[in-house]
Swiss-Prot record:
It comes from Homo sapiens. Glomerulus of kidney. Also detected in brain, lung and placenta. The modification Phosphotyrosine is found at residue 1210. This is Receptor-type tyrosine-protein phosphatase O. The lineage of its organism: Eukaryota, Metazoa, Chordata, Craniata, Vertebrata. Coiled coil: none annotated. GO terms for biological process: axon guidance; cell morphogenesis; glomerulus development; lamellipodium assembly; monocyte chemotaxis; negative regulation of canonical Wnt signaling pathway; negative regulation of cell-substrate adhesion; negative regulation of glomerular filtration.
Length: 1216
């Protein structure tokens, strides 16, 4: 035997063999058998052999691959059979025989199909089918799953004396529900076989597994009896006395033939499962003879049974109801007056519903839950009669049992139980079957609640209110805060007392009549709201932490404290209550928590609530709050500089993330304390101050951050100011031997030292000791007559000398020289003449100013309409302009400058430059004049500005490829001044961006005015920033204003870098103020990196101007940008939305701020005209044009104030 193909012979025979499989269908006879060990044995018969030279091959298919086997070569005897070990049990295999003579097929082949036997079931479990144990079972079988194939399961069993078998296929994971058996039947010898089936050539093969598991047996539950009912009959007294001697002492009942009165009772209680009780071996037979009655019977029918509920209440009954001591007064009087006469109980029922196999009934009679009688009757009995010899509460139940066969005896499920009460007087009391309805709770206070309910029955005489705490068991015993209702407490009062605030309770109501108690009501759950905390206190621990402490009520139950805080969150820009911490409840009456990581100088509101265990949770109380403003952090003085008697102080506050815009910081208090104490209050947005301090003193400098409720002071900075030299030193009262020196003290000085020495003598003469004086005058004596001296006065403060102040003095000669008298007279006359000349000049100056106001400041004449084309030489124009600058500003008009500006040239509108210089000393009067008649003269000037640049071309902006790059179709860049991008793309328009160069105070391309980027142009915008090496971007708009998009958000939202084309932008830092924000960007392109500052002014309305009160804010912003620009290279990029209105106003203010620093005149008209010749519509509205004038007025006012503060006059003393 061998496998094919093998070696050379296998290769030689493979192709004919495959051809044979396709060609032939007829068969040669051969024999195939399947052994028990799953081996397939294939053997040749004598009739199969054609010649010993032929090759016989077997092909076996059925598994994932085909197998080929070759019979061994043989001569006179048949070859041994081929044995194939099948891997699968229960799988069909196809065996094909092929005969090959040499390389030629000489005999057709044929196929035989065999089916292997599946592996048997190893174990079986049978369970009741809980929804229907009378007819249903759950089968669970276990069998080998690997390599085991079957289609159905054969179930065999004996049903009583009948043998049954069936094929079942609805097994899932070895389990199935079979719901077709008979109730109460014993099913024995239950076995399971796996069945495998296969169909081949219209024939079906079937194989059964063996049975290797232990046979099982199972009895289904019988149905319970039907229509169980009982009647109670009062026996005739005489009959009872005759038979009283036959009562068994050990039993509370016996049989009785004589029947007195009978009554019909209706019991509707469900019966619990019958417990094992004492079976009475001497139970009397029931009597089925005729009964003598004295009244119409009343039947208790069980058809209207109530749900099973009485057994649930057994464990919660009060102890007082477990014996007969709880009988009513009527019952007690009855039992005291009469002896109990037994009553007759007649119990009847009907057989269970067919088909049910049963062998009898079990009767269970229970009295007072302590005494039990348990007996059995056959299947023919349907009535049971017994005498009840003792009063009490009785419970009856009847069940069906089945015992025939080899299975265990089994009872039916419990049917309905019947309950009633027999009083000592023989009176029966019907069981209560209705539960209370509409149970509700009304909480009267934090410790009291009132229960209410409704009931249709009126035959109950009391109620039981059962209360239990649901929260008590949720607490650890060591931390338990309540004791009263941890176990169930019963009461007959509708009012529940001694409740605990915060606890949750469950209440059940029962109706009671005598010892009988009805079914419970639906449970009602209610909770008592906690009373909340008390004495909430706050203790600050610095700028960023506080401690909260509080006490809780002595009486109360809760799960946890929840500490919340309310504040403005600068990260989310919202204010809301957030939970900070939760503290588990303890028995301690006090609690505290430390709250850290607070923002300094910030308003907080803290709240502590008590949360209960209930579901849902209750909390109290929102009024337990306390507010607080944290202290600011201490500022840090960073620089102190002193010059010109002014001390310049700078400081920082917090770190880069500290937010002042939303804090409760009010102002800074800068204090310099020396011999004098100088204070200055500084607004919170400014961190610099200038103090005018007298020199010569030692000062302790401090900066205090002040809020509404607290402050924090920086570390003291010691500053020692050197004493200043005396001011205005004079020599008076000169004599031949003495001179008096007089000076003015400058700053603080402890004393002054005076020295005098002779001039021009080889022998230096000076005072033996310096004269130290504390006053401002000293007389130097013992001088030589007619001698010149150099005297000096030095201030001393804190042992430090100042720079000495010198004066040359000469003593008087002994006799008066006549020439001196003449010279003195001439000097006096000259002084009078000079004074008269000064008075005359002052009068002329006033008249000149009056003439300037009358002629009208800023008047200009438009010669644009004149048809004249004349040009003057350049030198002439310079001379004219130089001459005009000498005239009063009221004469600086377009009329006089007509030849200089040359409006009649060929390119007049393009090159025309309107101008109107104004002296700053006259600027206030100029503004008043221009603002007359509703800003009429401003309107005239602005109308002239509209003519600038009308004929300047902008062809690139009109190209079809570039139109989509323009935010507004009427704001287009001029070709001659537009910014051109460097692009590798040679496509037309690739270099276009809506931006123009604007000349500045320092450079002809100091600014780039551009529109707010669009989503399509943000990449071009960053390319322009990189190529122009711009380090400052000024954004004068918000991305969205009045629900309209004004500009794309072209920078990253977070610190995560974002790629804009080939350029990556990363936001390094961001700082926001009330009116602006400063951002630091880092842009990267290949190996090139550049830092860019982004200044965003957010308080500027579109097409408008900031309010008059906000003018100082915008000037401060312009000054801040200018300070940064002096440190930067490349043009500043300025944009708003269109890039003309707010952009032009900002550029004008920045240029004027620099111009006024160095000059005392301005030409606003000429400046705006020049900007409009480089980009259209710069300074877009008349309001913006007027706003520039108002800002210039403010600039000049501040410059004059600075001059007044720093104007320290030193008088030079001439030589005598």
């Amino acid at each position: 035997m061998g496998h094919l193909p093998t070696g050379i012979h296998g290769a030689r025979r493979l192709l004919p063999l495959l051809w044979l499989f396709v060609l032939f269908k007829n068969a040669t006879a051969f024999h195939v058998t399947v052994q028990d060990d799953n081996n397939i044995v294939v053997s040749l018969e004598a009739s199969d052999v054609i010649s010993p030279a032929s090759v016989y091959v077997v092909k076996i298919t059925g598994e994932s691959k085909n197998y080929f086997f070759e019979f061994e070569e043989f001569n006179s005897t048949l070859p041994p059979p081929v044995i194939f070990k099948a891997s699968y049990h229960g799988l069909y295999y196809i065996i094909t025989l092929v005969v090959v003579n040499g390389n030629v097929v000489t005999k057709p082949s044929r196929s035989i199909t065999v089916l292997t036997k599946p592996l048997p079931v190893t174990s079986v479990s049978i369970y009741d089918y809980k929804p229907s144990p009378e007819t249903g079972v759950l089968f669970e079988i276990h069998y080998p799953e690997k390599y085991n194939v079957f289609t159905r399961v054969n179930i065999s069993y004996w049903e009583g004396k009948d043998f049954r078998t069936m094929l079942y296929k609805d097994f899932f994971k070895g389990k199935t529900v079979f719901n077709h058996w008979l109730p109460g039947m014993c099913y024995s010898n239950i076995t399971f076989q796996l069945v495998s089936e296969a169909t081949f050539n219209k024939s079906t093969l079937v194989e059964y597994s063996g049975v290797s598991h232990e046979p099982k047996q199972h009895r289904t539950a019988p149905y319970p009896p039907q229509n169980i009912s009982v009647r109670i009959v009062n026996l005739n007294k005489n009959n009872w006395e005759e038979q009283s001697g036959n009562f068994p002492e050990e039993s509370f009942m016996r049989s009785q033939d004589t029947i007195g009165k009978e009554k019909l009772f209706h019991f509707t209680e469900e019966t619990p499962e019958i417990p094992s009780g004492n079976i009475s071996s001497g139970w009397p037979d029931f009597n089925s003879s005729d009964y003598e009655t004295t009244s119409q019977p009343y039947w208790w029918d069980s058809a209207s049974a109530a749900p099973e509920s009485e057994d649930e209440f057994v464990s919660v009954l009060p102890m007082e109801y477990e014996n007969n001591s709880t009988l009513s007064e009527t019952e007690k009087s009855t039992s005291g007056s009469f002896s109990f006469f037994p009553v007759q109980m007649i119990l009847t029922w009907l057989p269970p519903k067919p088909p049910t196999a049963f062998d009898g009934f079990h009767i269970h009679i229970e009295r007072e839950e302590n005494f039990t009688e348990y007996l059995m009757v056959d299947e023919e009995a349907h009535e049971f009669v017994a005498e009840l010899k003792e009063p009490g509460k009785y419970k009856l139940s009847v069940t069906t049992f089945s015992s025939s066969g080899s299975c265990e005896t089994r009872k039916s499920q419990s049917a309905k139980s019947l309950s009633f009460y027999i009083s000592p007087s023989g009176e029966w009391i019907e069981e209560l079957t209705e539960k209370p309805q509409h149970v509700s709770v009304h909480v009267l206070s934090s410790t009291t609640a009132l229960m209410s309910w409704t009931s249709s029955q009126e035959n109950y005489n009391s109620t039981i209110v059962s209360v239990v705490s649901l929260t008590c068991q949720k607490q650890k015993e060591s931390q338990r805060l309540e004791k009263q209702y941890c176990t169930q407490v019963n009461s007959s009062k509708p009012i529940i007392e001694n409740l605990v605030p915060g606890a949750q309770y469950q209440v059940v109501i029962y109706l009671r009549k005598g010892p009988l108690i009805g079914p419970p009501s639906d449970p009602v759950t209610f909770a008592i709201v906690p009373t909340g905390i008390k004495d909430l206190m706050l203790y600050p621990l610095g700028p960023t932490a506080v401690v909260l402490s509080w006490t809780r009520p002595y009486l109360g139950v809760f799960r946890k404290y929840v500490v919340e805080m309310f504040y403005f969150n600068p990260a989310t820009m919202t204010s809301e209550w957030t939970t900070y911490y939760e503290i588990a409840a303890t028995v301690s009456l006090t609690a505290s928590v430390r709250i850290a990581n607070l923002l300094p100088a910030w308003y907080y509101n803290f709240r502590v609530t008590m949360v209960t265990w209930g579901d849902p949770e209750l909390s109290c109380c929102d009024s337990s709050t306390i507010s607080f403003i944290t202290a600011p952090v201490a500022p840090e003085i960073t620089s102190v500089e002193y010059f010109n008697s002014l001390l310049y102080i700078s400081w920082t506050y917090g770190d880069d993330t500290t937010d002042l815009s939303h804090s409760r910081m009010l102002h800074w208090m800068v204090v310099a304390e020396g011999k004098k104490k100088i204070k200055k209050s500084v607004t919170r947005n400014v961190m610099t101050a200038i103090l005018s301090l007298p020199p010569g003193d030692i000062y302790n400098l401090s900066v205090t951050a002040c809020t509404e409720r607290g402050s924090n002071t920086s570390m003291l900075r010691l500053v020692k100011l050197e004493p200043a030299p005396p001011k205005s030193l004079f020599a008076v009262n000169k004599t031949q031997t003495s001179v008096t020196l007089l000076w003015v003290e400058e700053g603080v000085a402890d004393f002054f030292e005076v020295f005098c020495q002779q001039v021009g003598s080889s022998q230096k003469t000076k005072l033996q000791e310096p004269v130290a004086v504390s006053s401002h005058v000293v007389t130097i004596s013992s001088l030589l007559p007619a001698t010149a001296y150099n005297c000096s006065v030095t201030s001393f403060s804190h042992d430090s000398p100042s720079v000495p102040t010198f004066i040359a003095v000469s003593t008087m000669v002994t006799e008066m020289n006549p020439n001196v008298v003449v010279i003195s007279v001439l000097a006096i006359l000259s002084t009078l003449l000079i004074g008269l000349l000064l008075v005359t000049l002052i009068i002329l100056r006033k008249k000149h100013l009056q003439m300037a106001r009358e002629c009208g400041a800023g008047t200009f004449v438009n010669f644009a309409s004149l048809e004249r084309d004349g040009k003057l030489p350049y030198n002439w124009r310079r001379s004219i302009f130089a001459f005009l600058t000498l005239l009063p500003s009221c004469l600086w008009t377009d009329y006089l400058l007509a030849f200089y500006i040359n409006p009649w040239s060929k390119n007049g509108l393009k090159k025309r430059k309107l101008t109107n210089p104004v002296q700053l000393d006259d600027f206030d009067a100029y503004i008043k004049d221009m603002a007359k008649d509703s800003d009429y003269k401003f309107s005239l000037q602005f109308e002239e500005l509209k003519l600038i640049g009308l004929d300047i071309p902008h062809f690139a902006a009109d190209l079809p490829l570039n139109r989509c790059k323009n935010r507004y179709t009427n704001i287009l860049p001029y070709d001659f001044s537009r910014v051109r991008l460097v692009s590798m793309n040679e496509e037309e328009g690739a270099d276009y961006i809506n931006a123009n160069y604007i000349p500045g105070y320092n450079s002809p391309q100091e600014y780039i005015a551009t529109q707010g980027p669009l989503p399509e142009t943000r990449n071009d915008f960053w390319k322009m920033v990189l190529q122009q090496k711009s380090q400052i971007i000024v954004m004068l708009t918000q991305c969205n204003e009045k629900r309209r998009v004004k500009c794309d958000h072209y920078w990253p939202f977070t610190e995560e870098p974002i790629a804009y084309g080939d350029i990556t932008v990363e936001m390094i830092s961001e700082e926001e103020q009330d009116d602006w924000a400063c951002r630091h960007f880092r842009i990267n392109y290949a190996d090139e990196m550049q830092d860019v500052m982004h200044f965003n002014y957010t308080a500027w309305p579109d097409h408008g101007v900031p309010t008059a009160n906000a003018a100082e804010s915008i000037l401060q912003f312009v000054h801040m940008v200018r300070q940064q620009a002096t440190k930067s290279k490349g043009p500043m990029i300025i944009h708003c939305s269109a890039g003309v209105g707010r952009t032009g106003t900002f550029i004008a203010l920045d240029r004027l701020l620099q111009h006024i620093r160095d000059h005392e005149f301005v030409d606003i008209l000429g400046l705006v005209s020049e900007m409009r010749s480089y980009r259209m519509s710069m300074v877009q509205t008349e309001e913006q044009y007027i706003f520039i004038h108002q800002c210039v007025q403010l600039m000049w006012m501040k410059k004059k104030q600075q001059f007044c503060i720093s104007d320290v006059i030193y008088e030079n003393v001439s030589k005598s």
